[in-house]
Amino acid sequence: MASMRESDTGLWLHNKLGATDELWAPPSIASLLTAAVIDNIRLCFHGLSSAVKLKLLLGTLHLPRRTVDEMKGALMEIIQLASLDSDPWVLMVADILKSFPDTGSLNLELEEQNPNVQDILGELREKVGECEASAMLPLECQYLNKNALTTLAGPLTPPVKHFQLKRKPKSATLRAELLQKSTETAQQLKRSAGVPFHAKGRGLLRKMDTTTPLKGIPKQAPFRSPTAPSVFSPTGNRTPIPPSRTLLRKERGVKLLDISELDMVGAGREAKRRRKTLDAEVVEKPAKEETVVENATPDYAAGLVSTQKLGSLNNEPALPSTSYLPSTPSVVPASSYIPSSETPPAPSSREASRPPEEPSAPSPTLPAQFKQRAPMYNSGLSPATPTPAAPTSPLTPTTPPAVAPTTQTPPVAMVAPQTQAPAQQQPKKNLSLTREQMFAAQEMFKTANKVTRPEKALILGFMAGSRENPCQEQGDVIQIKLSEHTEDLPKADGQGSTTMLVDTVFEMNYATGQWTRFKKYKPMTNVS
């Protein structure tokens, strides 16, 4: 049992004091050296390492005087064991601490009588002598400049750099400057926000126009005369004003109609009802599913679901990344066509009052791919503002003569609207996707990472039945790249695999009306 207690104490001391990075006993050891621990140390002292013995002996100096008096016998026995040790440093420390438990003082008269101390001091003197002797500067060095000091004392040895300060990177400095500037800007904005701004009270500062009637205010409300005192006049002379703006805002929606205008309102409601019925027939879905499709339909498929969303395709410019010319929407408002039979011989009053910049919309600097189109649509030349009169027709008197070279020849422009006018009505009635086609298109576009919006519009129009080829110079078969990804395919000999670049292509045949999807495989080495 005693041997087990000794081994436990020795292991505990080694864990506490055996660290080589700390060569001095810490003051916290005083709380660990109790009477029971000192008694166990006395029994296992001979089995401890030299470093632990030294730290233990030096740790007794941190004990309070009252504790030293209580454990005087055990401490004297430990110091006696240390004085018989083979290590010279343990032996020297034991000689120094020989008088400490009795008197509380150290024995420092060892140099002359102890040969062990003489040997240790000799070794220390040799090691200190190996170091470079310190060069003492003259007293007048603080009054001399660098050149005079070098002349007097010789070249000075540069100081040894024991460590280097870690400077902050330049990005941290820039970040701090930006934060400071943003803080100053925010404070300036707060200060400027506190300044009173008259735009909030513009209803009080603006002059009232009494020449035109105010909309939505009942006739019974008292109006102020033009000669009434201002808003800031005394309250006794003021005409009563309606109490709050919210009441006026609610009353603005009220509009007084004449009896003769009731027929027009009824006709408008009837037209709205008929339009809703037509939309419901085209989509062929219940009311709940119709609202989901209306919200989820992208703008490139607007013409295939509802005729009210045609403007979104005309207003969206074609993306320049396409490898061919995307077609304009198959469904075009009828006002974009000009049959020759309906062309007026002279400009009407509505055209005469038109601003002069509208006829100059087809400028001579249009891209060449837009010039190659047959003049069927006006929306292809001016997608932002579809005009009721096509500037490509030579019969329109408002077209300037400078635009004539950029358009097609006059006979083609006159004949094309006559031949295409009946064809225009056909896609307007028949262009609609079935439920299966809509799901197939959604599934196809879900993984497509190379197709653009005009290409999606062209694919949906072809699936719905449009047979107008926008790129006739490429033939009846047009291919559109849907997606591009890589696949690891096994080699022909069955050993290993090779990485191939896979292109998913959508092919449309305008001659037969059939479409297919297939994959093209290319080795990665051929791809730049």
From Swiss-Prot:
PROSITE patterns: HDAG (PS51838). This is Negative elongation factor A. Pfam families: NELF-A_N. Residues 189-248 are annotated as: RNAPII-binding. Essential component of the NELF complex, a complex that negatively regulates the elongation of transcription by RNA polymerase II. The NELF complex, which acts via an association with the DSIF complex and causes transcriptional pausing, is counteracted by the P-TEFb kinase complex. Keywords: Nucleus, Phosphoprotein, Repressor, Transcription, Transcription regulation. GO terms for biological process: negative regulation of transcription elongation by RNA polymerase II; positive regulation of transcription by RNA polymerase II. Residues 89-248 form the HDAg domain. It comes from Homo sapiens. Residues 320-341 have a biased composition (Low complexity). Residues 215-245, 320-409 are annotated as: Disordered. One of its GO terms (molecular function) is molecular adaptor activity. The NELF complex is composed of NELFA, NELFB, NELFCD (isoform NELF-C or isoform NELF-D) and NELFE; NELFA and NELFCD form a stable subcomplex that binds to the N-terminus of NELFB. In vitro, the NELFA:NELFCD subcomplex binds to ssDNA and ssRNA in a sequence- and structure-dependent manner. Interacts with the RNA polymerase II complex when it is not phosphorylated by P-TEFb. Residues 227-238 have a biased composition (Polar residues). The HDAg-like domain is essential for transcriptional repression, and mediates the interaction with the RNA polymerase II complex. One of its GO terms (cellular component) is nucleoplasm.
